Amino acid sequence: MTRPSDMRADVRASTVSSAYRRFWADVGEHFPDLGGAASTRYYSENERRLFAEHFPPLDGLRVFKSDLWDEAKNTRILAWASRQGARAYGIDISEPTVIEARAAFDREPLCGAVADVRELPFCDASFDAIYSMGTIEHVRDSERALRELARVLRPGGRAIVGVPNRHDPFLRPLVAAALQALGLYAYGYEKSFSRRALREMLERAGLEVVAETAILFIPGWLRMLDLACHVWCRPLAAVTGALVWPFAFLDRHLPAVRRYGYLLATVATKPERGG
């Protein structure tokens, strides 16, 4: 088991700008909790299915997550994995997010650190499984982040990497781009990827793609509206929840639609040494 004392001692001084750190610290400190919204429950259902279908049994598995936003504000997927017996590790650029994320763990404590996904403070081959959903699109040098994820994954280990789907049929990338241009997007800089582009980036990082799917078959605007109602107008959340339900129903009963979710989810493995 990797412990904090096993973290790399040779990590270079962070090149992350202070403005970037301040932005995410402010988001982590002031962003409302999204847990309990209908679309968040649907999101959580999707994530648990990914874990069940693409990771080995979680008991004793060293699972690393590339940000702790979900643990602080959203699905609490890593805390769920911990309750299934996984050994949970994660980093986030925001100290308030790391502090809040730790509170979600009630079985075993989270080994969490304030760090940049492009400069991970862990030794090579530290983890059996890596879950990175909605992280690397927020940094301009996404390939560097993927190389770091590949470095800390053990040979034979599996990674699930998720990013916004450039070809989302409900055009969420256009909505996000418009909000960014207006300075209204809560998550700062974000880019989207095609399935092919993500696959090629993973391969350049030294990983072998073994499966491609997606999660959140739902219009991005509906997810945003549902969260807004959950936070600021609970009576209307019943309405948005009813609108979420048909998409969740299709997802459960017509698996073919999952390919069109607004977050790609590509599964990759790290080749065994000498393989």
Regions found by a protein language model. Give the residues of each.
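A short acidic, Gly/Pro-enriched loop at the edge of an enzyme's catalytic core
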Residues: 118-129
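Class I SAM-dependent methyltransferase SAM/SAH-binding core
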Residues: 62-119
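Short alpha-helix
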Residues: 189-206, 212
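A C-terminal cap/extension of S-adenosyl-L-methionine-dependent methyltransferases
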Residues: 176, 211-275
